């Protein structure tokens, strides 16, 4: 069984959507907030983290495309040994538009759990 030795994990909230906790920190991401560029930046960070033995990755649907970015990175690996944590109960609504009025919606109902976890 794979053992998680490193106590440090990597959360992808700031890399999975163009406007989140990364607003005002564009110097580390750059001005290009397109999905392709953000995916590329996310993959660069994941490459670095994996080389440093980070094996826990935190994603969520409310983190925009973080789940897709991580899964596309995992598919590129020859071998992946790690853990992925995700969450339910929040829905990302901004559709990659930083100017959107409402970016997320919280719904902790049983029907929403079924929708997100067991479609």
Feature annotation, model-predicted:
Residues 80-95:
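A short, structured active-site edge motif that brings together acidic residues
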Residues 44-46, 95-98:
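A broad, low-specificity signal for short, low-complexity segments enriched in glycine/proline
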Residues 17-20, 92-97:
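A short acidic, helix-capping loop that chelates divalent metal ions and anchors anionic groups
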Residues 1-83:
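N-terminal binding-site loop/beta-alpha segment at the start of enzyme catalytic domains
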Residues 26-34, 100-119:
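Glycine/proline-rich, positively charged
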């Amino acid at each position: 069984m794979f053992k998680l030795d490193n106590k440090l994990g990597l959360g992808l909230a700031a890399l999975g959507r163009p406007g989140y906790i990364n607003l005002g920190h564009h110097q580390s991401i750059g001005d290009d907030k397109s999905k392709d560029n953000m995916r590329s930046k996310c993959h660069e960070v994941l490459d670095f983290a994996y080389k440093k033995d980070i094996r826990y990755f935190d994603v969520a649907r409310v983190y925009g495309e973080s789940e897709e970015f991580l899964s596309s990175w995992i598919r590129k690996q020859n071998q992946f040994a790690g853990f992925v944590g995700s969450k339910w109960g929040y829905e990302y609504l901004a559709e990659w538009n930083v100017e959107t009025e409402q970016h997320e919606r919280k719904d902790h109902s049983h029907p929403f759990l079924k929708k997100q976890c067991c479609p």
